[in-house]
Amino acid sequence: PDRLNGGVIGIASALGWHDSGQHVHQCHQLLFAQAGCMTIELGNQVYLLPPSRAAWLPAGVPHQVLMRGVVAYRSLYFTPQPELPASVQVVAVNPLLREIIERMALWPWNKPEAEQRLTLALFMEELAQAPQETWQLPLPTDARLGAWLQEIKRGNILPERLNRLAERVGASDKTIGRIFMKETGMNYQAWRQQWRLLRAMELLAEAVPISRIATALEFSSDSAFISFFKQHTGQTPLRYLNSRGESHQPS
């Protein structure tokens, strides 16, 4: 797809566990999951892409995509043009934009440009009007935390309490605290809570039952998890899903 002669090429595929590694494209890309959930790492920021969000990546932007469950993967590749966005965007996807993405992802690779124009114009209009999303997690870059971060990204461990993390990396609690405040703008406890929240959203998008999410994230009970989620989002998990058109999750 990096060698486009014009127009848009789409990819639609069902993918399981996948780590793309950091890479770049010579063309613009839109990433979207019709079902399931992806995370995308851009610089030292991690963004969540459930079915209610899409990421616009201009040509040349290094990124890494991780899928920990089954994802209905959609990717659109665009020939760089002045009228297309030149900066990274993570946007909310309404029902119309969702259907436009699906149509473009499924059309033939040899579809004539003239037959793409109306759909592409509607796509650009909807993308320009889509609200920006802000749920993200800044990552520390200190080398002492590198191996620990990789284990977390792979889902092998959860972010532990501060004293246990300090023991793991051979640093003091205060040193770890300073690293997180300097490199993420958050104290470690706030960072850990933000990580748990985004991981909960990811699991909800993958249709994991609330009881299993509560256990996986080491909450003392389902009600403790629901209270935590509501405290941070203002909504219960199921109300959050309903508000975003992701209400297929079991309770």
What does each model-identified segment do?
Residues 163, 182-226, 242-251:
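Terminal helix-turn-helix DNA-binding modules in bacterial transcription factors
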Residues 1-37:
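Generic protein-terminus/edge-of-domain signal
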Residues 44-59:
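Short acidic-glycine-tyrosine-enriched beta hairpin
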Residues 83-153:
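Amphipathic alpha-helical segments enriched in hydrophobic/aromatic residues interleaved with Lys/Arg
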Residues 52, 176, 180, 224-225, ...:
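Short hydrophobic/aromatic patch on the recognition helix
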Residues 104-112, 126-134, 148-161, 180, ...:
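Basic, amphipathic alpha-helical hairpins
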Residues 167, 178, 182, 215-216, ...:
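Alpha-helical residues within the helix-turn-helix
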Residues 60-88:
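Ligand-binding loop in jelly-roll beta-barrel domains
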